[in-house]
Every structure is written in C-alpha cells, then in structure tokens.
Amino acid sequence: MEQGYGGYGAWSAGPTNTQGAYGTGVASWQGYENYNYYGAQNTSVTTGASYSYGPASWETTKASDSLGAGGPAVHMASYGPEPCTDNSDSLIAKINQRLDMMSKEGGRGGSSGGGEGMQDRESSFRFQSYESYDSRSCLPEHHPYRPSYSYDYDFDPMPDRNGGFSSQYGDCRDPARERGSLDGFMRGRGQGQGQGRFQDRSNPSTFMRSDPFMPPSASSEPLSAPWPELNYVGGRGLGGPSPSRPPPSLFSQSMAPDFGVMGMQGAGGYDNSVPYGCGRSQTRMRDRPRRRGFDRCGPDGMGRKRKQLQIYDEPDAKLARADSEGDFSENDDGAADFRSGDEEFRGEDEFFDPGRQRGEKDDEDDEVKKRREKQRRRDRMRDRAADRIQFACSVCKFRSFEDEEIQKHLQSKFHKETLRFISTKLPDKTVEFLQEYIVNRNKKIEKRRQELMEKESTKPKPDPFKGIGQEHFFKKIEAAHCLACDMLIPAQHQLLQRHLHSVDHNHNRRLAAEQFKKTSLHVARSVLNNRHIVKMLEKYLKGEDPFTSEAVDPEIEGDDTLGGEKEETPEEVAAEVLAEVITAAVRAVDGEGAPAPEGSDTPPEGQGPVDTAEATHSPHSEQLVEVETPCGAAPEKGDANAEAGGETTEAAGEEQEVVAKTDGAVDGTVRGAAPAPPVTETKAEQTEAEPKDVTPTE
C-alpha cells in the first residue's frame, strides 16, 4: 500500500481487493481496482480507527443484512457492471490530484459515520452513509423525503434518460450537506460543480436562495458517493456507464470548469452525454432555460437560451463522442453561451434603434404621403384621359376599348334588365332618355377615337413584355377576368366551364347582379342630376332632339357623363356658378361697355384673346380667377377646386374662353372683396352679389 497523496491516502491498483488507507487509519476505500470503481466487493477492512467501511452490493438483501442502527460498519455502495482493464498509473495520479483539490478547500479531515465529532463540514460530502441503488429496500424509513418511485434499471439508464437520478427533481435536500458546500462551489472544487448546477437548474425554487449551488442530498440522490464529488459529471454521472465507453469526466483535462457571474459555470454542463452527464432527459433540459445571470431571466432571453441549448444538446443525444471531444464541447458551449448573450443584447439594441429614429421616420412618412398623393393625381389624370376614349355604359359600369363589345352589351340581357330595374324607380321616359344618351355618347367617343388614332398611328405601341427573357419563364396567354369572383382564369374551355359551373361562382354572380342593380339606380340618378343633362332631358321630354344640338361640346358631354357617376360636391357647384357669373360679366363689358360688377375696371386695351390663347385650353383655366387673390393659400385651393370640378370646368370651356380678356376686371373684383376669405365663400358672395348688376345679353 503506497503512501497517500497529501495525507488522504492513495488508491491501490492491485488485482485483488486492495484497500487504500485514508489519512492515518481513518477508513479503507474499496472497489477502485483496475479503474473499476463500480466493482462489487465483499471484504470489509477495519483499521485502527473505529470507522470501517464495508461494501454494499447492488443486491439489496446483502446491504440490508449488514446495515443497522449503530452498526460497526457504514456501508458504501460499490458499483461495477463490468471490469476495466486499464491499470495505468496515470489514472491513479489523476484520482489523487482530484483528492488534493478537495484538501485545498477544507484542509480538515475526519468525519463521523456513527455520530462522533462532525468537525468538518466539507468532509460531509465524502463520508456518510451510502444507500444502495434501491433506497427503499435497504433504508425503508431512513428519510421522510425519500422519493416514492422505484429505480428499475439494469446497470444502464439509457432506456430512460433519467436513470436512477430522476429523484433529484423537486426533492428536499439535506441541510447538513448544504451547509458546507457554498464556499466549495464558489471556489471551483474540481469538476464536481456539475452536480450542484444540475440540481439547482432542475429545480427553479432553489435558484435564488442564499445557497444557490448546493449539491443534492443523499436521500434525493441515492448514488451520491465521494467519487461523484470528484468528477465533473456530478453524482448522477455514476448511475450506470454505457458499456461502449468509459466515463468522460475521469479523463477531463480541465480540473475546474469556467465560471461566469456569481459562480455560474460558463462551460456547458448540458453538453455532456446523457448517461454520464446529468441523466436528465433532453426534453427536460430544453423545457427549463439556462440562467447565466440574475439580469437575464426575461421571457425573450429564455427563449433565445432555449434555442441555443437545443443546438448543443441534440448532437450529444445521438453521437457517442470521445472524451477530448467532450471537453472541447464544454468549452465551446460556454463560449457559445456568452456569444448568445452578446447577440441577445445586440438584438435588443437593434430593437430600440427605431425608437430613436422616430422623428426621421415621421419625416419619411410625410414625404411618402406626398409622393403617393402626386401619384394619385397622375393616375386620376391618366384615367380621365383613358375614359375619354373608352366605351362605357354608365348605369351598368361596363367599359371596353372595343366597339363590338359595347354594342353587344347595349343589346344584352343584362343591360336590359338593369334598365328595367331603373324603370321601377324612375319614369319610363327618363329611362328611355338614358338609353339614348348612352348610345349617343358612345358614338361621339368613337369619333374621338378615330381622330386620336389618326394622330398617333405612327407611334409604336410599347411592348409590356420587353426585357423579359426566357429565364423568367413568362408566357403570354389569354385570360378571362371574373368580376364577381375577382379571379383571372386562363382562356381555356375546360377551365372556363369548370369555373362557370362552380358553386362559388354562381353564388358570387347572384350577389354581384343584385349589387349592380342597386348601384345602377344610384348612378342613373347622379347622371340625371348633372345640370347639362338636365337641360338635355328637358328638351327630350318636350319632344326635341337634344343630341343634335351643338350647344354643348361633345367632349364635355362625355366627361359630364363620366362625372355623373358620382354626385357633385358643393365646390363643383360653386365653380360652375362662378364660371357662369364671370362669363356674363365679361359679355356685359365687351358688348355694352358697361362697368363690370362691383366696381371692376375695364381690361387693358392691349389684352385680348390672342394674348391668352394658350391658357384658354388649359384644364385648370379656373386658376386665372383665383391667382390674384391676396390670400396665400388661394392658389392651392384653386388647384384642388380645379381638380374636383374639372369636368364642370371643361363643360364651361366655351364660356371661359373670354375670361382672359377681363383679367383686370376680375382682379379688381376679387381685390374689392373682403381679404382672405375661403375660396368657396368668395364664390358664394360673388354668386349672390354679381347677378344684380349684370345686364343680361341674351
């Protein structure tokens, strides 16, 4: 028997049941021959002291026979599913080094197994009564908090990942063991920290206590022996090694794992393989997140930690790695642990960055709104220009660029049913006028289209497929658009028939037909409320032909019809009245030489229609009236007014040709008014006051 390392005794590697004396006659250790610290032995050696340690085998009957209250021997559970042939001295030296790590912490020896002189708190980790694997059979009433479920395992906890250690979850811990453990855990007592770590992290109630890194009690941990305190995997690492490989912790090169804040290990305790690590199931390890510090317990942080945990756990559950690989993975896991924290805080900084730039985003939103408004105006003008050359049935909301299609529609059953529905709400004569009006309007649109085609026939049409190559896999096809279902269907007979006979289409088309009928009545009334069409209707009811009269420009009539689909706003009505008043005033000034209403001056002699010929055909010619107003916001309102009442402005195009002649008169008229009233109010005042002084010229 060789001398112990540092006074603790050495471990003999003899082929037989050798004993290593602990200190000077303290107790003999057994069962570590041939690196077989699981080997069951049947020899009890007693030294000079009264502390004798006999073995307790896996068979509970033997352990029960030799265990009793006040017995001379305190049994130690020795476990050995298979012998190991590695008999090297390096293993013994490593074991002694780990014993020395414990001696540096406490420096005190001696403990009482039978109740004599518990002088050392630290030694309580090493010398206590050890239960057999089945704690119920050998110690029926040993501890009131002993777990109530069995450990049915045959030396290999692989079928159940928890092995014999599932009792650690939520069990009561022994205060005697916990009292002297905090300082050892804070100092890094070898690789035994993994035991306390798994206990604390598996039980959330123990995390924020004053002793957060206590190892579990003997009752909740039937395999807690002095050996588990020396290896990194903890007491649960001895549950039953896999026959395929030795325990990795015995060959670990790192004597103390890395520590983070408050003594928490940065190295990955969860990275160990299951039978040697903590024995916890992978699902339980994922269910509870890691806690790297007291300031990282938020739900978001937990979610990130759990994801990080899965990355490093799953390979260990599937692959049997070498010991050196296990060590490197522990360090790597710790590095990844802190890297994940940095990424977490970086993500939080990025999350709060938008809050710091809200002012800039508000400005960007304003710019985006302005751009969108401009785009809407351009789209409106483009649509208006397209409507001038597009065939349309206003009451049915049918539009087409093909003459044949509009003719078919006017003779279709749908169009006739729509007019029949309108005739139930409006007089028959009015409905007939609507039909005649729609037909005549489309004739005028056809003439306009022919003129435009002659002018623009030389211009090549843009190809929408220009720049689209075969790599985009585009193909030009014909398709049908189902307005009721809002769906595009390729123009193939099978697909079209399938859609036409589908239940959804038949349901949607009935709803659409009802909706179109209701809308058609509203549109018809709006069209008939237009002042130009009202005059035409009066002539039609008198028996005259309103469509042959050239009093209204055909182009304007078409625009009026399009505008009739929506009711006129008060601004549009005011603009129309103002245009009429100005026209009457101009005629009075030019024809009779009378002063313009409200003291307006005569126009300059040099000013005439030629000078403003270009402005005559402008769609915003109404701005000529309002541009001289002293109010700074008047021109902008004039723009909006001109857009809102653009159709009416075009309707009064002939009358407004003479507006340019009386710029001075209009200027005087507006300047004589009250300063800076709203544009509509100014128009209303002029509407009320001016007709009194106007001499009718008709």
Swiss-Prot record:
Region (RII-binding): 572-589
Keywords assigned by UniProt, alphabetized: Cytoplasm, DNA-binding, Immunity, Innate immunity, Isopeptide bond, Metal-binding, Methylation, Nucleus, Phosphoprotein, Protein transport, Repeat, Transcription, Transcription regulation, Transport, Ubl conjugation, Zinc, Zinc-finger
Modification after translation: Phosphorylated on tyrosine residues probably by SRC subfamily protein kinases; multiple phosphorylation is leading to dissociation from nuclear structures implicated in chromatin structural changes.
One GO MF term attached to the UniProt entry: DNA binding
Region (Required for interaction with MYCBP): 576-593
Biological process, per Gene Ontology: innate immune response; protein transport
Record has Membrane as a keyword: no
Region span, Involved in condensin complex recruitment: 526-569
Compositional bias (Gly residues): 108-117
Annotated crosslink Glycyl lysine isopeptide (Lys-Gly) (interchain with G-Cter in SUMO2) location: K318
Location of the region described as Interaction with DPY30 in the Swiss-Prot/TrEMBL record: 1-213
Region (Interaction with MCM2): 1-198
Motif Nuclear localization signal per record, residues: 369-378
Assembly and interaction partners: Binds to dimeric RII-alpha regulatory subunit of PKA during mitosis. Interacts (via C-terminus) with FIGN. Interacts with CCND3. Interacts with NCAPD2, CCND1, MCM2, RPS6KA1, PDE4A, CASP3, DDX5, CCNE1. Interacts with NFKB1; detetcted in the cytoplasm. Interacts with MYCBP; MYCBP is translocated to the nucleus and the interaction prevents the association of the PKA catalytic subunit leading to suppression of PKA activity. Interacts with DPY30; mediating AKAP8 association with at least the MLL4/WBP7 HMT complex. Interacts with HDAC3; increased during mitosis.
Function (record text): Anchoring protein that mediates the subcellular compartmentation of cAMP-dependent protein kinase (PKA type II). Acts as an anchor for a PKA-signaling complex onto mitotic chromosomes, which is required for maintenance of chromosomes in a condensed form throughout mitosis. Recruits condensin complex subunit NCAPD2 to chromosomes required for chromatin condensation; the function appears to be independent from PKA-anchoring. May help to deliver cyclin D/E to CDK4 to facilitate cell cycle progression. Required for cell cycle G2/M transition and histone deacetylation during mitosis.
The protein's name: A-kinase anchor protein 8
Species name: Canis lupus familiaris
